[in-house]
Design a protein with these regions (language model features):
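Fe(II)/2-oxoglutarate oxygenase catalytic core
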Residues: 1-143, 147-212
Length: 212
C-alpha cells in the first residue's frame, strides 16, 4: 500500500460544513486513495495496475469476513502518512453529524483502520470519551461503529490522532457505507431509543468517565 500510494500523496483535507472540503491545521498529513477496481477500473484515464486491483480485493474480502459487513460501496482505502508533528485533532468520522444541509446521506456506518508501520514515539489514536488510547503497531487494526442502530451519530466515537514525536506513521482508513448494509446489519427493533440531544449524551458520558 505504501509503495502504491507514495507517488500520489497530497496534503490531506477535511470537511468543513461551512466551506466544504479544504485544508486545515486540524489535520497535518499527506494521503492518497486506492479505489475499488470493480467500480473504478480506470483512474484519470489510466487503468488500475493489476497488483493494485488484486491488493484491494484481497483486503476488502478480509474486511468483510472479519466484520460481516458488505464492503461494496465504500469510499476506498485512504492511505495517510504522518511526519514529525503530524496529527489529526478531535473529530467524528460520520458525515451526517457534520452536514448542515438537512439531507440524510449515505453515512459512514463504521470505520476500519489499520497501521502499516511501527512508530518510534507518539501517534496514538485516542478516544477521549471512552478513555481509550491505541498505540500504532504494524499489522494491528482498529474497528468501530460510528452510528447507533438508528443511524444517529454515536458521540462516544470522538477521536484524534496524536502528534508524531519520532519517526513517521502510515495508516489506512476504510469507511463502510450505511446504505449497503440493509441486508447485513438492518435497523433493530427499538433502535430509535437514542433520542437524547447530543449535549445530553456528551454530558452523560463525561460524567460517567469522571466517576471512574
Amino acid at each position: 500500500m505504501k509503495s502504491l500510494t507514495t507517488p500520489h500523496l497530497n496534503s490531506a483535507n477535511v470537511f468543513n460544513p461551512d466551506a466544504g472540503v479544504q485544508q486545515s491545521e486540524d489535520r497535518i498529513s499527506n494521503n492518497a486513495w486506492l479505489y475499488d477496481p470493480d467500480r473504478y477500473p480506470i483512474i484519470s484515464g489510466v487503468p488500475q495496475p493489476p497488483e493494485q486491483a488484486h491488493l484491494y480485493r484481497v483486503i476488502n474480502k478480509r474486511l468483510e469476513d472479519c466484520t460481516g459487513l458488505n464492503g461494496v460501496g465504500t469510499e476506498g482505502f485512504q492511505v495517510n502518512n504522518y511526519g514529525i508533528g503530524g496529527h489529526y485533532l478531535w473529530h467524528y468520522d460520520s458525515l451526517y453529524y457534520n452536514d448542515k444541509s438537512g439531507t440524510y446521506k449515505n453515512d459512514r456506518l463504521a470505520t476500519w483502520m489499520f497501521y502499516l508501520n511501527d512508530v518510534v514515539e507518539g501517534g496514538n489514536t485516542v478516544f477521549t470519551r471512552l478513555n481509550i488510547a491505541i498505540p500504532p503497531m504494524k499489522g494491528a487494526a482498529v474497528f468501530w461503529y460510528n452510528l447507533h442502530p438508528s443511524g444517529l451519530n454515536d458521540f462516544r466515537t470522538l477521536h484524534a490522532g496524536c502528534p508524531i514525536l519520532q519517526g513517521t506513521k502510515w495508516v489506512t482508513n476504510l469507511w463502510i457505507g450505511e446504505f449497503e448494509q440493509i441486508f447485513h446489519k438492518p435497523c433493530l427493533k427499538g433502535a430509535d431509543r437514542e433520542t437524547s440531544s447530543p449535549h445530553d449524551i456528551i454530558n452523560y458520558y463525561e460524567a460517567l468517565l469522571a466517576s471512574m
